[in-house]
């Protein structure tokens, strides 16, 4: 329940009272002077310390950023060098493989040519042997055949001439 005295007091607070304003201002100035004497220095010191801490953090952050950028540049350079080195290794590997392929191909061609030449030589030797054997057999058969024919009509000198003539004919046909 409200009394009339309470209402009066509330009304007086809302109306300006010069004495109250004066004492409030004096109290405010005294509190301000006390705060300046006692608390202003530590508050300013704390603010300055905080400012220094923030500035130090900013400086460290900038330094870390610069270091990170330097590391990033260095890493990019290393990556570029690694790429160049890998390209060089791949290129050298391809060149080596191509050289090796060429060497193997040349060696195979050389070996094949040697084998072909050797086979031709063997064939030629076998051909000569076969022709020699054939010539001897033909000569023997011719001698036998001629001997039979000539026995009846020729003597020994004539037989030798006929055989020599046949051998000569065979040799000239071969060459």
Swiss-Prot record:
Pfam families: ATP-synt_B. Keywords: ATP synthesis, Cell inner membrane, Cell membrane, CF(0), Hydrogen ion transport, Ion transport, Membrane, Transmembrane, Transmembrane helix, Transport. The keyword Isomerase does not apply. The chain crosses the membrane at residues 20-40. GO terms for cellular component: plasma membrane; proton-transporting ATP synthase complex. Signal peptide: none annotated. InterPro entries: ATP_synth_B-like_membr_sf (IPR028987), ATP_synth_b/b'su_bac/chlpt (IPR002146), ATP_synth_F0_bsu_bac (IPR005864), ATP_synthase_B_chain (IPR050059). It comes from the Bacteria. It is found in: Cell inner membrane. GO terms for molecular function: proton-transporting ATP synthase activity, rotational mechanism; proton-transporting ATPase activity, rotational mechanism. It is a single-pass membrane protein. SUPFAM superfamilies: F1F0 ATP synthase subunit B, membrane domain (SSF81573). The keyword Repeat does not apply. F(1)F(0) ATP synthase produces ATP from ADP in the presence of a proton or sodium gradient. F-type ATPases consist of two structural domains, F(1) containing the extramembraneous catalytic core and F(0) containing the membrane proton channel, linked together by a central stalk and a peripheral stalk. During catalysis, ATP synthesis in the catalytic domain of F(1) is coupled via a rotary mechanism of the central stalk subunits to proton translocation. HAMAP family: ATP_synth_b_bprime. F-type ATPases have 2 components, F(1) - the catalytic core - and F(0) - the membrane proton channel. F(1) has five subunits: alpha(3), beta(3), gamma(1), delta(1), epsilon(1). F(0) has four main subunits: a(1), b(2) and c(10-14). The alpha and beta chains form an alternating ring which encloses part of the gamma chain. F(1) is attached to F(0) by a central stalk formed by the gamma and epsilon chains, while a peripheral stalk is formed by the delta and b chains. Belongs to the ATPase B chain family. This is ATP synthase subunit b.
């Amino acid at each position: 329940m409200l009394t009339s005295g309470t209402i009066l007091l509330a009304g007086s607070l809302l109306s300006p009272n010069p004495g109250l304003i004066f004492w409030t201002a004096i109290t405010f100035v005294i509190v301000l002077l006390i705060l300046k004497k006692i608390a202003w220095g530590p508050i300013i010191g704390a603010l300055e310390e905080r400012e220094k801490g923030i500035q130090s953090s900013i400086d460290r952050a900038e330094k870390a950023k610069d270091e990170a950028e330097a590391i990033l540049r260095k890493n990019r350079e290393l990556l570029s060098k690694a790429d160049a080195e890998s390209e060089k290794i791949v290129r050298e590997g391809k060149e080596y493989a191509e050289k090796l392929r060429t060497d193997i191909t040349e060696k195979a061609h050389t070996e094949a040519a040697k084998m072909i030449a050797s086979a031709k030589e063997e064939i030629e030797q076998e051909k000569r042997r076969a022709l020699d054997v054939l010539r001897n057999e033909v000569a023997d058969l011719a001698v036998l055949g001629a001997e039979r024919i000539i026995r009846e009509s020729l003597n020994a000198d004539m037989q030798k001439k006929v055989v020599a003539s046949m051998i000569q004919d065979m040799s000239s046909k071969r060459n």
